[in-house]
């Protein structure tokens, strides 16, 4: 069982005509790096675009002191950070658009595009997918945005959007696998 994880200490949800908003926060790196992490997500009302902003920040005086000490003692230009977006094994992912985006092809034929604001390095790396009922993990990939947090606040913006030429109604569910209502 995986138990080494940060605990989400704040969660806010709201729905607007433009879409749904979700805010999450944890202070999982406060003790070691003086950084807390928040993620703002906005899902468009038509479901075709997810916009995210991840913020790593030293917010309290104690966090700022810890972050400064880490930077000074290590003579660092910044603390190494990585945002990881794990993909399902059935998703075919490829770096696209001159290294500025990742194209994601689903079994259904849907194409989605992951983009970022350019403040970090974009890469695809190996990962594993843990599935209930399977004894062994399945090999997969993850999108990684990596860089340095060199200030008290570092923001990284990204989007996951359905490609324009993909029809609205396609779904990757196999109708034969869906349960039949009784």
Model-identified regions with their sequence ranges:
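CBM-like, beta-strand-rich accessory domains located in the C-terminal region of large
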Residues: 1-182
């Amino acid at each position: 069982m995986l138990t080494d994880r940060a605990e989400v200490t704040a969660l806010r949800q709201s729905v607007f005509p433009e879409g749904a908003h979700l805010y999450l926060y944890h202070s999982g790196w406060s003790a070691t790096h003086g950084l807390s992490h928040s993620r703002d997500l906005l899902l468009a009302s038509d479901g075709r675009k997810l916009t995210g902003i991840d913020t790593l920040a030293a917010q309290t005086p104690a966090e700022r002191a810890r972050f400064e000490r880490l930077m000074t003692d290590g003579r660092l230009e910044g603390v190494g950070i990585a945002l990881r977006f794990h993909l399902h094994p059935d998703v075919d992912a490829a770096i696209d658009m001159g290294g500025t985006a990742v194209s994601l092809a689903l079994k259904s034929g849907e194409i989605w595009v992951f983009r970022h604001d350019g403040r970090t390095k974009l890469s695809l790396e190996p990962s594993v997918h843990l599935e209930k009922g399977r004894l062994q993990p399945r090999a997969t990939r993850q999108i990684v945005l990596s860089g340095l947090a060199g200030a008290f606040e570092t923001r990284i913006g990204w989007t996951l959007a359905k490609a324009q030429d993909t029809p609205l109604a396609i779904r990757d569910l196999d109708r034969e696998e869906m349960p039949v209502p009784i």
